[in-house]
Regions:
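Cytosolic, long alpha-helical scaffolding segments
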Residues: 1-228
Length: 228
């Protein structure tokens, strides 16, 4: 029988692998490279000097080859490990890794819903429409950058960054509210159409879900140093 500590480390390792794949998929689907995310340039500067990749990111293929296999392996291993664990606290810790894997899988699915609009409208000749979609890209990029910073920080700062990510969930709700207010203004001054307003609001909602799923997964996967 596998020891609990060994099972948790195995789950963490595979979950990190799943996160790394998700991270790369999200970054490329919103038009950024790993270098962009890890740089110290502002996303405003990056967006001003960067062109979209000519080819679309095939999210169906990437989900099947980079996400689904790992997701199913984590769920299978977790379920088998839980059979041998009677302690409720330990069982819950294993369950958390299941949920983290589920959140990362859902991230890719939700990304598929907004990918086409993000690429289309962030390059729109309508500067007001483009700005709203580039805000979505910037917000996602900032989140990925924050998570990358989390992974290289020492124990003391790690706790603070985790707390900031948790606060980020509340900030996401504020962004939704601000977006609604802003697009209503754009409609009132006829800078965007009603159809474009609906697209912005729907895509912002899905972008928020993606961010929440990433944060929830990261809280589990990268909290090793503050949970032991």
């Amino acid at each position: 029988m596998v020891k609990f500590s060994a099972a948790i480390e195995a789950l963490r390792k595979e979950s990190e692998h799943l996160y790394n794949n998700t991270y790369a998929i999200v970054a490329h689907a919103i038009g950024f490279s790993r270098k962009d995310i890890q740089s110290d340039k502002s996303f405003k500067e990056i967006l001003e000097n960067k062109k979209w990749f000519s080819k679309n990111v095939d999210l169906d293929y990437l989900y099947q080859t980079r996400i689904k296999v790992l997701f199913e392996a984590i769920i299978d291993f977790s379920t088998k490990a839980q059979v041998y664990v009677n302690d409720e606290t330990k069982n819950h810790k294993i369950f958390n890794f299941k949920m983290a894997a589920k959140n990362l899988a859902e991230t890719t699915k939700n990304l598929k819903i907004i990918q086409a609009n993000i690429k289309k409208y962030s390059s729109s000749s309508n500067e007001f429409l483009a700005l709203e979609y580039n805000k979505i890209r910037s917000n996602q990029g900032e989140l990925l950058r924050s998570i990358e910073e989390l992974r290289v920080e020492d124990r003391e700062k790690l706790y603070l960054i985790i707390k900031n990510l948790q606060k980020g969930k509340e900030i996401l709700k504020e962004i939704d509210t601000l977006t609604l207010s802003n697009v209503e203004h754009l409609i009132s001054v006829r800078k965007i159409t009603t159809a474009e307003e609906i697209s912005i609001l729907n895509d912002t909602t899905f972008a928020t879900k993606i961010a929440e799923e990433l944060i929830s997964a990261v809280e589990v996967i990268f909290s090793k140093d503050i949970s032991n």
